[in-house]
Amino acid sequence: AFVPAASWEETRAVDPAYVCCTFRGSVTALNVSDGSVVWKSWLVDEPRKTGVSAAGTDLYGPSGVGVWSAPTVDARRGLLYVATGDNYTHPATDKSDAILALDMKSGRIVWTQQTTAGDVFNATCPRGAPNCGPDHDFAAPAILVRAANGREMLVAGQKSGVVFGLDPADGGRLLWQTRVGQGGTAGGIQWGMARMSIVASTGS
Protein backbone atom coordinates (compact mmCIF):
# COMPACT_ATOMS: atom_id res chain seq x y z
CA ALA A 1 0.00 0.00 0.00
CA PHE A 2 1.19 3.52 -0.82
CA VAL A 3 0.19 6.18 1.72
CA PRO A 4 0.56 9.92 1.00
CA ALA A 5 0.82 12.58 3.72
CA ALA A 6 -0.57 16.12 3.80
CA SER A 7 -1.18 18.63 6.59
CA TRP A 8 -3.21 21.68 7.56
CA GLU A 9 -0.21 23.09 9.44
CA GLU A 10 -0.13 26.04 7.06
CA THR A 11 -3.32 27.30 8.78
CA ARG A 12 -1.49 27.49 12.14
CA ALA A 13 0.77 30.24 10.81
CA VAL A 14 -1.98 32.74 11.66
CA ASP A 15 -1.06 32.28 15.36
CA PRO A 16 1.90 34.63 16.08
CA ALA A 17 3.15 32.25 18.78
CA TYR A 18 3.19 29.16 16.56
CA VAL A 19 6.59 27.97 15.33
CA CYS A 20 5.86 27.57 11.62
CA CYS A 21 6.38 25.33 9.85
CA THR A 22 7.94 21.88 10.12
CA PHE A 23 5.60 19.53 8.24
CA ARG A 24 7.21 17.54 5.40
CA GLY A 25 5.19 15.91 2.63
CA SER A 26 5.95 12.24 2.03
CA VAL A 27 4.85 8.95 0.54
CA THR A 28 5.19 5.72 2.54
CA ALA A 29 5.05 2.17 1.19
CA LEU A 30 3.59 -0.35 3.65
CA ASN A 31 3.63 -4.14 3.61
CA VAL A 32 -0.08 -5.03 3.50
CA SER A 33 0.47 -8.31 5.34
CA ASP A 34 1.82 -6.77 8.55
CA GLY A 35 1.80 -2.97 8.13
CA SER A 36 5.58 -2.64 8.29
CA VAL A 37 7.25 0.23 6.44
CA VAL A 38 8.97 -0.84 3.21
CA TRP A 39 10.21 2.64 2.36
CA LYS A 40 9.43 6.30 3.01
CA SER A 41 10.22 9.09 0.57
CA TRP A 42 10.40 12.64 1.92
CA LEU A 43 9.49 15.31 -0.63
CA VAL A 44 11.15 18.25 1.11
CA ASP A 45 14.37 18.59 3.10
CA GLU A 46 14.46 18.68 6.90
CA PRO A 47 13.26 22.15 8.02
CA ARG A 48 15.81 24.38 9.73
CA LYS A 49 15.54 27.68 11.57
CA THR A 50 15.45 30.51 9.04
CA GLY A 51 14.76 33.50 11.27
CA VAL A 52 12.56 35.06 13.92
CA SER A 53 9.19 36.72 13.37
CA ALA A 54 8.22 40.22 14.53
CA ALA A 55 6.50 38.50 17.47
CA GLY A 56 9.76 36.81 18.46
CA THR A 57 8.73 33.34 17.27
CA ASP A 58 11.21 31.07 15.51
CA LEU A 59 10.56 30.48 11.81
CA TYR A 60 11.41 27.22 10.05
CA GLY A 61 11.68 26.12 6.43
CA PRO A 62 11.48 24.64 3.93
CA SER A 63 8.19 22.91 4.68
CA GLY A 64 4.96 21.71 3.08
CA VAL A 65 4.79 19.85 -0.26
CA GLY A 66 1.87 17.76 0.99
CA VAL A 67 0.32 15.02 -1.12
CA TRP A 68 -3.46 15.49 -0.96
CA SER A 69 -4.50 12.60 -3.19
CA ALA A 70 -3.75 8.94 -3.83
CA PRO A 71 -0.69 8.19 -5.98
CA THR A 72 -1.28 6.93 -9.51
CA VAL A 73 0.19 3.47 -10.16
CA ASP A 74 1.98 2.75 -13.45
CA ALA A 75 2.63 -0.98 -13.10
CA ARG A 76 4.20 -1.30 -16.55
CA ARG A 77 6.93 1.22 -15.77
CA GLY A 78 7.14 0.38 -12.07
CA LEU A 79 6.40 3.98 -11.12
CA LEU A 80 4.11 5.93 -8.81
CA TYR A 81 2.98 9.38 -9.93
CA VAL A 82 2.47 11.82 -7.06
CA ALA A 83 0.84 15.26 -7.25
CA THR A 84 2.16 17.75 -4.67
CA GLY A 85 1.03 20.96 -3.00
CA ASP A 86 2.79 24.21 -2.20
CA ASN A 87 5.49 25.07 0.31
CA TYR A 88 4.29 26.50 3.64
CA THR A 89 7.41 28.54 4.40
CA HIS A 90 10.52 29.74 2.62
CA PRO A 91 12.76 28.70 1.00
CA ALA A 92 10.67 27.43 -1.90
CA THR A 93 11.68 24.02 -3.26
CA ASP A 94 11.61 22.31 -6.64
CA LYS A 95 9.14 19.56 -5.70
CA SER A 96 6.21 21.77 -4.70
CA ASP A 97 3.27 22.19 -7.12
CA ALA A 98 4.67 19.33 -9.15
CA ILE A 99 4.10 15.87 -10.56
CA LEU A 100 6.73 13.42 -9.33
CA ALA A 101 7.54 9.89 -10.46
CA LEU A 102 8.74 7.53 -7.71
CA ASP A 103 10.21 4.06 -8.12
CA MET A 104 7.64 1.65 -6.68
CA LYS A 105 10.26 -0.67 -5.17
CA SER A 106 12.55 1.88 -3.52
CA GLY A 107 10.71 5.21 -3.32
CA ARG A 108 13.53 6.91 -5.24
CA ILE A 109 12.38 10.03 -7.06
CA VAL A 110 12.90 9.30 -10.76
CA TRP A 111 11.76 12.62 -12.22
CA THR A 112 10.02 15.87 -11.27
CA GLN A 113 7.90 18.21 -13.39
CA GLN A 114 7.18 21.41 -11.48
CA THR A 115 4.53 23.66 -13.00
CA THR A 116 4.54 26.58 -10.52
CA ALA A 117 7.85 27.59 -8.98
CA GLY A 118 8.18 29.72 -5.85
CA ASP A 119 4.69 29.00 -4.48
CA VAL A 120 4.98 29.57 -0.72
CA PHE A 121 1.62 30.02 0.99
CA ASN A 122 0.19 29.87 4.52
CA ALA A 123 -2.65 31.41 6.53
CA THR A 124 -0.87 34.75 6.96
CA CYS A 125 -0.98 35.42 3.21
CA PRO A 126 -4.60 36.67 3.00
CA ARG A 127 -3.61 39.35 5.53
CA GLY A 128 -1.00 40.76 3.16
CA ALA A 129 2.12 38.95 4.36
CA PRO A 130 5.11 39.42 2.02
CA ASN A 131 6.58 36.88 -0.39
CA CYS A 132 3.39 34.84 -0.77
CA GLY A 133 2.64 32.55 -3.68
CA PRO A 134 -0.74 31.85 -5.35
CA ASP A 135 -1.58 28.61 -3.41
CA HIS A 136 -1.80 26.55 -6.59
CA ASP A 137 -1.52 23.01 -5.21
CA PHE A 138 -2.13 19.86 -7.16
CA ALA A 139 -4.91 18.43 -4.97
CA ALA A 140 -6.27 15.89 -7.47
CA PRO A 141 -4.31 12.83 -8.63
CA ALA A 142 -2.77 12.68 -12.09
CA ILE A 143 -4.63 10.43 -14.53
CA LEU A 144 -2.73 7.97 -16.74
CA VAL A 145 -4.54 7.82 -20.08
CA ARG A 146 -4.04 6.55 -23.61
CA ALA A 147 -4.63 9.21 -26.25
CA ALA A 148 -6.44 8.66 -29.55
CA ASN A 149 -3.09 8.13 -31.29
CA GLY A 150 -2.21 5.33 -28.85
CA ARG A 151 0.28 7.41 -26.89
CA GLU A 152 0.19 7.20 -23.09
CA MET A 153 0.24 10.43 -21.13
CA LEU A 154 -0.38 11.82 -17.68
CA VAL A 155 -3.13 14.42 -17.38
CA ALA A 156 -3.00 16.59 -14.25
CA GLY A 157 -5.26 19.45 -13.15
CA GLN A 158 -4.04 22.18 -10.80
CA LYS A 159 -5.72 24.79 -8.56
CA SER A 160 -4.37 27.31 -11.06
CA GLY A 161 -7.20 26.21 -13.37
CA VAL A 162 -4.72 24.72 -15.84
CA VAL A 163 -4.64 21.11 -17.06
CA PHE A 164 -1.25 19.69 -18.08
CA GLY A 165 -0.37 16.79 -20.36
CA LEU A 166 2.93 15.07 -19.48
CA ASP A 167 4.90 12.32 -21.20
CA PRO A 168 5.55 9.47 -18.71
CA ALA A 169 7.99 7.86 -21.14
CA ASP A 170 10.18 10.97 -21.36
CA GLY A 171 10.82 12.12 -17.81
CA GLY A 172 7.47 13.87 -17.46
CA ARG A 173 8.17 16.23 -20.36
CA LEU A 174 5.42 18.82 -20.76
CA LEU A 175 3.39 18.07 -23.90
CA TRP A 176 0.70 20.74 -23.56
CA GLN A 177 -1.19 22.88 -21.09
CA THR A 178 -4.73 24.27 -21.29
CA ARG A 179 -6.60 26.68 -19.03
CA VAL A 180 -10.04 25.31 -18.18
CA GLY A 181 -11.08 27.58 -15.29
CA GLN A 182 -10.29 30.43 -12.94
CA GLY A 183 -7.49 29.65 -10.52
CA GLY A 184 -7.17 30.62 -6.87
CA THR A 185 -6.82 29.40 -3.30
CA ALA A 186 -10.24 27.74 -3.58
CA GLY A 187 -10.55 27.69 -7.36
CA GLY A 188 -9.29 25.77 -10.35
CA ILE A 189 -9.20 21.99 -10.11
CA GLN A 190 -9.06 20.59 -6.58
CA TRP A 191 -10.43 17.20 -5.59
CA GLY A 192 -11.01 15.31 -8.81
CA MET A 193 -10.95 15.43 -12.58
CA ALA A 194 -12.92 13.49 -15.18
CA ARG A 195 -11.14 11.54 -17.86
CA MET A 196 -11.99 13.30 -21.11
CA SER A 197 -10.65 12.01 -24.41
CA ILE A 198 -10.67 15.45 -26.03
CA VAL A 199 -8.43 16.85 -23.29
CA ALA A 200 -6.10 13.86 -23.24
CA SER A 201 -5.74 13.77 -27.02
CA THR A 202 -5.42 17.42 -27.95
CA GLY A 203 -5.07 19.48 -24.81
CA SER A 204 -7.96 21.69 -25.87
Please give the residue ranges for each predicted region.
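Extracytoplasmic/lumenal domain signature
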Residues: 1, 10-11, 16-62, 74-80, ...
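Residue-level signal for short, function-critical loop segments
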Residues: 7, 86
